[in-house]
Amino acid sequence: MVRFHTPSEAAAYLAPILDRPVEPCETELAPGIVLQMAALPLSGGAFVNSYTVTWRHPARAALCFADPPISAPDFARGSESVVTTTGGFFFLADYCRHRPRTLSLNLAIRDCRVSSLPVSDQDALVNRDGALSVVAVPAHGELTLGQRPFRWAGSRTQHDADCYAYGNANSVILHQPDARTGKARIFQESSRFTSEITCSRWSDVGFMARPDGHFAAVSRQDRGQLDMFRHDLVLRCPRALAREGARLEVHTIGPLSLGRSIEAAISVGPCLSYPDLSRHPLNDDRSLGSFPLLAERPATRLVFYRTTDGAQHLCLLDGRPGSDAFPGATLAETVALVHSRGPLAAGCFLDSGHTSKIAVRRDGALATYGNRHYLQWPGEADSSFVWTPDQGRPSASFIALHSR
């Protein structure tokens, strides 16, 4: 491992190593799974390295989760996947005393069961029978509480409902300057509690998941301030219904009907067809940080898309922050590059920036692509910045491709 005293020292060392166009090649990794690598030109003489995995039947995809977060290559080593990429947004803070029970932000469905109920409208990547699709998921639906049907809605929406969901996407992350690292992500501890209740109509109820997939009410607060991070699901509901031990079952989330057909889902976005990314609601989503997520700056980008011929693709456009020659791609450049590859049926951005990583099995060995500049920040035991090109940032969700 190579250690540095400062990020600028690391940048000077890494530039001649990493700022190089990749040699173009195309490799069949397994039946139905192909990896293509190429350096693509950008304006001003810059370039971006493109790594695209394309798959068709009989290959299958799976959405997977990790708690605690681990790196993409570590996840791949523990699985039989041919390709592993990082997935969707997750709770990420450099300084926090507590964290949510489910790290994947907003919507998370795991093994056909709800892990996190969305509190805001957001696109989702959904896995049905080994195939991925992009679905617009408004945060509302139907549930049963104490054997009675109710309409629910996310607490960050304006949807009319009988009860309102709170969850990990109510958290607030602030980006603040840091003399050592440049910036730090600070979790605002007060944001893990529900808002105050000032009338006798509502109560907040905390639920825990049970093995059969339903939720059981384990706590109640009539004045609000219920700790969302200590529960799998929190609902603000009519006080007459708020009783410990009550059974809750979620039936629908937007257009998604819960059942065995939906194996997994994670919040992602925005979709590649969104008309004006500068006005997308994710820019104001404080669970992702106080810096606008979709600012038009170059960065490493990871996207999923499906072309009209039925093929599915994962594309990582790689760069190194601060490089003039190898800066990564802007949002507009990413969309244009994807559209240049053929008629697009659907697509979305995944968690991009420093998180994006692809791990590939080739000839029995594991190779990784993307974000090879990644530095592990100083900790209590080590004050150095440690270069971890193969590992990268740990993540809480992954897309895994299997040959059948």
Region spans (language model):
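Gly/Ser/Thr/Pro-rich low-complexity, intrinsically disordered segments
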Residues: M1-R404
